[in-house]
Amino acid sequence: VRILSGERTPHNNPHAKGVFFGLTHQHGPAELARAVLEGVGYALADGMDVVHACGVTPESITLIGGGARSAWWRQMLADISGQQLDYRTGGDVGPALGAARLAQLAQHKEAVFSELLPQLPLEQAHRPDAERFARYAPRRETFRQIYQQLLPLMSS
């Protein structure tokens, strides 16, 4: 469970803590790094589940931010979530661009949304691989179970 400063969507738990589960002598720094990246993917997929439960089913989701620069990680996230994930030109500055676009919307309330906020050019679409998705599914369930079982210990 990769949590270092609390958990946000969908758990909203500022007391959540991170743990590594199932370590053996065979695990080294590479496996720990991969576990952190997978944990982020499981948490992202949990957030996507909430969106889907609200009746919103996007065809694809655009990844933004510095971490999204890694095509390898983007593919891992698609494989974990089972969702197509897109990377667009300028995605590494997406958070700042998103904030600027929200400011534009606040200033131009009557503007046509699609004209004010055009979609950035698609660089790469990451479609989930069915075999890897099936491999991640039980790990994701373990992630959920560990989080739930550790909840009573996280607030202390």
Q: Where do the protein language model's features map onto the residues?
A:
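Glycine/Thr-rich phosphate-binding loops that ligate phosphate moieties of nucleotide
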Residues: V1-S156
